[in-house]
């Protein structure tokens, strides 16, 4: 599903990735391990279009994406949950989830793109679309209404699925995101990413700053998402034990270079991995 081939990426003069190659098969969980500064987050930023590679190529479902904008990449079905969560702390849980659904339910026609450029809210975009279709006659207006109703049903289905994974978010749907606990904020960040109904989920350090019991719960849910939906997941994580426990395959990054690549089972048995990342 996802292939990186000899990807080199940099921040100004500082090269962060040196010829990185990796594959993420459809339906799998692949983890990238490494210390701080190894290039793990940079790898995800390159995939999601936040950092354009200097060299190499990135393909998603056979299509090159390394020259696409982040917005275009999101529209293909790639959702990036960044390190640090980056929630809208002044908005409620439900409002954050609605923003997560933006890319999927905003509409893909020219009128929808115009409405997005104008910065209209979701209800405003729907109204804009209906006005546009009305100019084409009653038949187009009826089609616009049907499309709106279908989008609404799809949105409600996505929201229900997120609340099924994270019941605490349903209980706190009207609570301001900035007042949630760290674990609840991480759940909200993942839920917001799921609202776009992605085919590939990029997870950057989901355990960061969380208590061990909360971390285990987060990883249990990540595994459930993969198993129940068949969702493909690329996971960047410092907690190698938990990451390898749910992953099918893993890569180890050191100073921007892949130094190990194997099945998660073999990596758990690898003495170098045990010494460096598993505390053995």
Regions found by a protein language model. Give the residues of each.
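Glycine-rich phosphate-binding loops of nucleotide-dependent enzymes
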Residues: 1-280
